[in-house]
């Protein structure tokens, strides 16, 4: 039995989306984000894709985003020889600026990998989120991830904002919050994600 590994999952019977599907999606996401915590992070580390995710707790999200998300991946990309010292300096500089770029809010429970491939429609026509990489973070991280690869209509963002308003200026921070998943894709797949991540970092420094 030691040669086998099992994964037991709940079966979700598929169905068709209801007319108010995206409003329901926004309500469920807002309900998820309404679960708050005293620190950013999680009591244990986990994974995003096959990459480890460091979740040690931080009081300020700017510190968490730098030390637990951006810089570990920059180190990995340097180890993979995608980045050199010159590129690393850009990310170090950005990390020092994050406290001026990201507004404070309560740590919210995030899905953590909310792209269009990570939700299903169940037999009642309701949205179901799957395959999370959860931690307590900044809500704008989930919102930005939803916009990275598309697949979500504008009405879901409008409905979310009505349920749980985002902090003023959030649209200007979308690229900043997309930096982490772009770095993840750079480490996993290389290619255009490497210059894209560097371009995002430079745009905020």
Q: Which positions does each model-derived feature cover?
A:
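Hydrophobic packing residues in well-ordered alpha-helices of helical domains and bundles
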Residues: 22-25, 87, 91, 197
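C-terminal alpha-helix
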Residues: 28-32, 199-204
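Generic structural signal for secondary-structure transition and capping sites
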Residues: 34-38, 70, 103, 165, ...
């Amino acid at each position: 039995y030691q040669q086998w590994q099992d994964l037991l999952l709940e079966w979700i019977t598929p169905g068709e989306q209801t007319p108010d599907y995206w409003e329901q999606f926004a309500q469920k996401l807002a309900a998820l984000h309404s679960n708050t915590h005293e620190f950013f992070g999680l009591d244990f580390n986990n994974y995003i894709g096959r990459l480890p995710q460091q979740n040690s707790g931080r009081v300020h999200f700017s510190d968490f985003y730098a030390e637990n998300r951006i810089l570990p991946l920059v180190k990995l990309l340097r180890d993979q020889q995608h980045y050199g010292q010159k590129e690393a300096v850009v990310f170090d500089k950005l990390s020092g600026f994050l406290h001026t770029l990201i507004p404070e809010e309560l740590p919210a429970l995030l899905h953590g990998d909310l792209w269009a491939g990570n939700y299903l429609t169940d037999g009642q026509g309701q949205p179901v989120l799957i395959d999370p990489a959860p931690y307590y973070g900044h809500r704008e991280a989930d919102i930005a991830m939803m916009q990275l690869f598309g697949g979500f209509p504008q009405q879901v963002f409008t409905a979310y904002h009505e349920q749980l308003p985002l902090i003023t200026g959030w649209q200007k921070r979308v690229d900043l919050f997309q930096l982490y998943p772009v770095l993840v894709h750079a480490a996993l797949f290389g290619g255009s994600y490497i210059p894209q991540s560097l371009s995002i970092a430079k745009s905020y420094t």
